[in-house]
């Protein structure tokens, strides 16, 4: 072959390889909301991840504080306008860090929610055991639960815990809250529904103030609600779905009124198998104002206005996903724009769970099967929705899913074998998983630093304003027991995700709360002023997010949602001060009225959240 011919041939090969590489890169970097280009792929490859020693920073490679230059502005994807492409920040390799926050929370944290404004978390468990590790305060009378035998309960079963100091305030509860549900009203009042025995028809109210007490209405609900799910509607009212022997749903009336009307649910009837596997269903408010309801392995879209089923989704194969199968779920972050498209995408994530008969095999045969290892995702507003699954690094049942303020998802707690229930799980799963929704399929999971405390049945995890995650609970015993395989757990931990790496400290914005509104209206354009020690802060590097506090129990994070707001402009207003012009969600379909934590995020690193109310 002549030299000129060989040279021409080599040049042709180089051009061809470059073209193919470019095409592959474009596919890999595509916004993977729909994943249509990834259909037919084999099960995602598991990453082999080395987790650093999380007990201290000594011995770690010294990392200089990062000064990140913003990339050039992108045109943005999707049909919305005024959002742009959010630049991917630096890859965060720090595995996170655990700290022991409290040695004794007083009550085991079966249920948890962050109360707005006062920055205290409400923990409560069950009253049926008539025991906890903290007494009612002086001046609060003991509860007489058996007048004939003069039996009284002087223990507290509800506590308010200061998330910064760990100070505990015990509160009195009289109705049984065991396996109940909850959510926040527009003004931040906690409404707790259902429970056990005399508490099953109860609605309880706890306002968000330092000296507030529980107010209980034992006949507020039409059906007995035990293991039910409560969801917030676009107008700020509530629906309660399901529960043991309650194959129906109802709407909560204003405080002090008793509901009498029930609506039958064919979904719950059709998914009620011999092991149940449809308790604590997943209920997510879709971006169109309708409700996505998932029970066992099936799901529907329900109109809360007409009470008609609008759509049935494909079945999710592989096993059971609701109690006692107990997967965990999230409505993935909702991306908004200055001008939003007519249909705003919404993806639901369901991760882990158990085999259909796992409960029976664990309880009757003492065989603890491996939990499910898959994580499935569904675009519920797609014309042809299809579950798209990938494999987690480890099996997991009874996990908790937490949306982080930067839009990433933390999957934490649970076990590798068995199911929910008393003593029915083995091999606690100590290592959290970080799920990055916008990464390509097969690259979304990263295993983080493990805890040393088992968090199995009756555990919780919730996001905090400082970006940490509060982790507590774990009681697989029928009562408070401490000399067993998995003792009743009273220790509370905090987990710092990778974005709290000390090396990223100078990338963390600080919201100037005196220059940021405390209340906004739907569709309002408003300013968020931040301090940030970075140069050339561009719109493509910044997000403003709103995170709704979730009511968390039994692997269900009720009403958890994060909105990525449309950003109109970002400008420097002197020195390290920057002003972000953001647009509030357009309606209660996207963000039900009430309190949210407002975060500014720079290259994946969030500020401390500030409370904001949307009305």
Curated annotation (Swiss-Prot):
Which molecular-function annotation in GO is an example for this chain? aldehyde oxidase activity
GO CC aspect terms: extracellular region
The reactions it catalyses are: an aldehyde + O2 + H2O = a carboxylate + H2O2 + H(+)
The organism sits in which domain of life? Eukaryota
Enzyme nomenclature, EC number: 1.2.3.1
Subcellular localization, per the record?
Answer: Secreted
Residue runs in coiled coils: none
Q: Does the keyword Ligase apply?
A: no
A Pfam family annotated for this UniProt entry: GO-like_E_set
Q: Which UniProt keywords apply?
A: Developmental protein, Glycoprotein, Oxidoreductase, Secreted, Signal
Q: Which residues form the signal peptide?
A: 1-25
What does the protein in this record do?
Catalyzes the oxidation of aldehydes to the corresponding carboxylate by coupling the reaction to the reduction of dioxygen to hydrogen peroxide. Substrates include glyoxal and other aldehydes. May be regulated by the transcription factor MYB80 during anther development and play a role in tapetum and pollen development.
Protein name (record): Aldehyde oxidase GLOX1
Lineage, broadest ranks? Eukaryota, Viridiplantae, Streptophyta, Embryophyta, Tracheophyta
Q: Which gene encodes it?
A: GLOX1
């Amino acid at each position: 072959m002549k030299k000129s011919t060989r040279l021409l041939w080599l040049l042709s090969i180089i051009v061809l390889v470059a073209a193919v590489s470019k095409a592959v890169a474009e596919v890999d970097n595509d916004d993977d909301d729909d994943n249509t280009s990834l259909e037919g792929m084999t099960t995602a490859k598991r990453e082999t991840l080395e987790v650093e020693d999380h007990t201290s920073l000594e011995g770690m490679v010294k990392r200089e504080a990062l000064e990140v230059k913003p990339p050039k502005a992108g045109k943005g994807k999707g049909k919305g306008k005024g959002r742009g492409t959010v630049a991917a920040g630096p890859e965060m390799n720090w595995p996170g860090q655990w700290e022991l926050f409290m040695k004794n929370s007083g009550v085991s944290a079966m249920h948890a929610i962050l109360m707005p404004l006062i920055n205290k978390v409400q923990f409560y468990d069950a009253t049926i055991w008539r025991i906890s590790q903290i007494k009612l305060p002086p001046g609060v009378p003991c509860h007489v639960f058996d007048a004939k035998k003069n039996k009284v309960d002087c223990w507290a079963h509800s506590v308010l815990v200061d998330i910064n100091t760990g100070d505990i305030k015990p509160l009195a509860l009289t109705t049984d809250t065991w396996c109940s549900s909850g959510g926040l009203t527009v003004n931040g009042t906690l409404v707790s529904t259902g429970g056990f025995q005399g508490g099953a028809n109860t609605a309880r109210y706890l306002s968000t103030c330092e000296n507030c007490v529980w107010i209980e209405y034992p006949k507020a609900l039409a059906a007995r609600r035990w293991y039910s799910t409560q969801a917030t509607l676009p107008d700020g009212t509530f629906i309660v779905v399901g529960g043991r022997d309650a194959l129906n749903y109802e709407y909560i009336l204003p405080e002090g009124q008793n509901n009498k009307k029930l609506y039958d649910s064919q979904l719950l009837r059709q998914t009620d198998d011999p092991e149940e596997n449809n308790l604590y269903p997943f209920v997510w408010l879709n971006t169109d104002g309708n409700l996505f309801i998932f029970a066992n392995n099936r799901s529907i879209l329900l109109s809360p206005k007409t009470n008609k089923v609008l759509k049935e989704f494909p079945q999710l194969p592989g096993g059971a996903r609701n109690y006692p199968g107990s997967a965990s779920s999230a409505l993935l972050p909702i991306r908004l724009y200055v001008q939003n498209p007519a249909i705003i995408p919404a993806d639901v994530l369901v991760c882990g769970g158990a085999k259909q008969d796992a409960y029976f095999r664990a309880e009757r045969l003492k065989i603890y099967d491996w939990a499910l290892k898959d994580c499935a995702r569904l675009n519920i507003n797609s014309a042809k929705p299809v579950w798209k699954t990938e494999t987690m690094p480890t099996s997991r049942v009874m996990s908790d899913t937490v949306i982080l303020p930067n839009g990433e998802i933390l999957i934490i707690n649970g076990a590798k074998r068995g199911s929910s229930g008393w003593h029915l799980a083995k091999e606690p799963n100590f290592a959290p998983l970080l799920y990055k929704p916008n990464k390509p399929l097969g690259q979304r999971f990263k295993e983080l630093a493990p805890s040393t405390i088992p968090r199995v049945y009756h555990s919780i995890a919730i996001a905090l304003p400082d970006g940490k995650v509060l982790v507590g609970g774990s009681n697989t015993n029928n009562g408070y027991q401490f000399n067993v395989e998995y003792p009743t757990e009273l220790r509370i931990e905090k987990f710092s995700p990778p974005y709290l790496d000390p090396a990223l400290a100078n990338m963390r914005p600080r919201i100037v709360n005196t220059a940021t509104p405390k209340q906004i209206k739907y569709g309002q354009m408003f300013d968020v002023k931040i301090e940030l020690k970075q140069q050339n802060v561009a719109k493509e590097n910044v997000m403003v997010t709103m995170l709704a506090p979730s009511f968390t129990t039994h692997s269900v994070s009720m009403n958890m949602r994060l909105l990525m707001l449309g950003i109109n402009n970002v400008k420097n207003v002197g020195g390290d001060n920057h002003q972000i012009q953001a647009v509030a969600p357009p309606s209660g379909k996207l963000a039900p009225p009430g309190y949210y934590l407002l975060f500014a995020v720079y290259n994946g690193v969030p500020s401390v959240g500030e409370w904001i109310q949307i009305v």
